[in-house]
Amino acid sequence: MLHTVNKSPFEHKALETCLKFARQGSAVLLIEDGVYAAARDTAVSPQVQEALKSVSIYALKPDVEARGMQDRVMDGVRLVDYEGFVDLVAQHKAVQSWV
């Protein structure tokens, strides 16, 4: 399953809830303000690092760049462009949006 998170983890619980329900082998795509979860050395970094052990985490590159975060993305989080976003949707049978 592909999970999408578009809310900042510093203002909403969407990421926390998503990671509780994401099963091993799932993919999580951070979009819009959700990309703040991809930043290294933050309060949520340990939670994201732990999740990377069982799920793939992606961040939408245009959203990362729009927030000036391209040099702060933690290791293990993969950046994708819009084409990569479409590919992720096509690869998964279901998409769950956490809002």
Regions found by a protein language model. Give the residues of each.
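Short, glycine-rich nucleotide/cofactor-binding loops
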Residues: 1-14, 34-40
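Structural motif
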Residues: 5-8, 62, 99
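N-terminal phosphate-binding or glycine-rich loops at protein starts, especially the Walker A/P-loop
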Residues: 10-33
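Short, conserved loop/helix-junction motifs that constitute active-site signature segments
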Residues: 20-24, 47-53
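Short, well-ordered alpha-helix to beta-strand connector turns
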Residues: 25, 54-55, 92-93
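Short internal beta-strands
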Residues: 27-32, 55-63
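Charged helix-capping and loop-helix junction motifs
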Residues: 41-47, 79
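C-terminal structural segments of small proteins and small subunits
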Residues: 67-99
